[in-house]
């Protein structure tokens, strides 16, 4: 965990996603003593590189959840700032290629990008060099967009018969998971959220049911939600906005987004951010109309 913190401090962006941190926290042995390859947390494997003195120089997490069904491994890695440009990143990438049964040297005829995916958060120059060296090509892009909250915000106009209320812990989980699955059936990570995943996040320090806004009809049936998050530095996040497909087209997603922005501003957030798929042009246009601009890009490279 210390290596990940040092990497984030140096780069200004977290080297791994939230789900990796949650899996590490789920098993203290992994947090405090990561072996070269350890797979005792379901769906995870861990690779480390140490220097000659035994100091941790680099770390890679491999998500194996889709290996049996889709044959895909998804990895994220971090190299300690003191050990960069000394081969630690290359050793980790080669270990990942070996784990995926891929040759170190890419074949010119190999156009498949589905077997191994490796994230570069913030499109770090070192990651771009490694991708070029090992024949990894861009397979997916995730934009981080943001805006200040000290300017005028639109009104959250709701469709007739729709109200917004706060999430009720221990009550609303099944409905949220149902709508989330329908809203994100196309999304490889978000659409797979289970009730257990949701309850795990409820135990995080940042979780606040008052910032988990649910849009319901007159029968209290869930139509959509806006789950907000406040980071330790005070930055707000449009964490997830999900609308049931049967309800889409009436502006509910925009109204939920605005309601969440107002909530975050009321909580003292000076700025807000969100993540959106780079090819989701419809969502990007909505956010741009709400004065969001692109901050940076996460890239998933594949072979």
Swiss-Prot record:
Q: Do the record's keywords include Repeat?
A: yes
Protein residues bound to acetyl-CoA 2? 241-243, 248-254, 280-285
Q: Which residues bind 1D-myo-inositol 2-(L-cysteinylamino)-2-deoxy-alpha-D-glucopyranoside?
A: 18, 189, 229, 237, 275
Q: Which reaction does it catalyse?
A: 1D-myo-inositol 2-(L-cysteinylamino)-2-deoxy-alpha-D-glucopyranoside + acetyl-CoA = mycothiol + CoA + H(+)
One GO biological process from the UniProt record?
mycothiol biosynthetic process
EC no. given is 2.3.1.189
Q: Where does acetyl-CoA 1 bind?
A: 77-79
Q: Name one GO molecular function term.
A: protein-N-terminal-alanine acetyltransferase activity
* N-acetyltransferase domain location: 1-150, 162-303
Q: Into which EC class is this enzyme placed?
A: transferase
Q: What is the purpose of this protein?
A: Catalyzes the transfer of acetyl from acetyl-CoA to desacetylmycothiol (Cys-GlcN-Ins) to form mycothiol.
**NCBIfam families reported for this sequence:** mycothiol_MshD
Can you tell me which family this protein belongs to? Belongs to the acetyltransferase family. MshD subfamily.
Subunit-structure text = Monomer.
Name-wise, this protein is Mycothiol acetyltransferase
């Amino acid at each position: 965990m210390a290596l990940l913190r040092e990497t984030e401090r140096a780069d200004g962006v977290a080297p791994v996603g939230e789900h990796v941190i949650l899996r590490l926290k789920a098993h203290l042995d992994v947090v405090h003593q990561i072996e070269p390859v350890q797979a005792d947390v379901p769906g995870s494997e861990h690779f480390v590189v140490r220097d000659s003195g035994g100091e941790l120089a680099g770390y890679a997490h491999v998500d194996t959840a889709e290996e049996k069904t889709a044959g895909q491994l998804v990895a994220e890695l971090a190299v300690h700032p003191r050990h960069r440009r000394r081969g630690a990143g290359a050793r980790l990438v080669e270990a990942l290629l070996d784990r995926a049964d891929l040759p170190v040297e890419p074949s010119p005829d190999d156009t498949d990008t589905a077997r191994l995916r490796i994230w570069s958060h913030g499109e770090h120059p070192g990651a771009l060099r490694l991708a070029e060296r090992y024949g990894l090509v861009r397979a997916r892009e995730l934009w981080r967009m943001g805006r200040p909250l000290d300017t005028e915000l639109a009104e959250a106009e709701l469709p007739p018969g729709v109200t917004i209320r706060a999430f009720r812990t221990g009550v609303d989980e099944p409905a949220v998971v149902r709508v989330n699955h329908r809203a994100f059936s196309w999304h490889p990570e978000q659409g797979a959220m289970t009730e257990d995943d949701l309850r795990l996040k409820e135990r995080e320090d940042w979780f606040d049911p008052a910032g988990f806004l649910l849009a319901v009809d007159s029968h209290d049936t869930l139509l959509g939600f806006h789950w907000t998050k406040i980071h330790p530095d005070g930055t707000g996040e449009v964490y997830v906005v999900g609308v049931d497909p049967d309800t889409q087209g009436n502006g509910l997603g925009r109204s939920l987004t605005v309601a969440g922005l107002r909530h975050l501003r009321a909580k003292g957030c000076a700025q807000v951010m969100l993540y959106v798929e780079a090819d989701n042009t419809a969502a990007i246009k909505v956010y741009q109309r709400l004065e969001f601009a692109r901050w940076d890009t996460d890239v998933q490279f594949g072979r």
